[in-house]
Amino acid sequence: MELDHEYRPRIHFTPAKNWMNDPNGLVWHKGEYHLFFQHNPQGRQWGHMSWGHAVSKDLLTWEELPVAIAEDDEGTIFSGSAISDGEDLVAFYTRHTETNQSQCIARSKDNGRTFVKYESNPVLDENKKDFRDPKVFKYK
C-alpha cells in the first residue's frame, strides 16, 4: 500500500491504519530491523492492545507485517523488548488485565513472522496493577 498523505511522517514509521503507541523491541535479526509497537488492530482509539510489527533494512523504508503478538482471553499485550538469540527472535512483553500486569515471553522461529507464546506464561508475576515494560538485552 502506498501511503502518500500530507500529514503522515516521512521518516518515522506509522501503521497503515489504526492506533499506534509505544514503539518497543527494536532489534536487528538476520538482515532486518524489527520494530514492534503497541497497536490496536481494531480501531483508531486506544484499546485491544497487541504488538504491531514492521521490518526495515535501512531504518527509513518500512514494511508493515501482520500483528506479531495478539491480545487473547488472558489479557492485552503491553510494551516490552525483544532480542535475537542468533536463531530465533524472543519477545518479552507485559500481559495486562484490569487488575494485574505480568511479564511474558513469546518466541519466533520464522524471522518474526509468527510468535508462539510460552506455555508457562507469565514468567514474572508480582500480582500488581502497575508492573510493566520489561527491558531485556543480550550481553556477550
PLM-predicted stretches and their roles:
Residues 1-140:
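Beta-rich carbohydrate-recognition and catalytic domains
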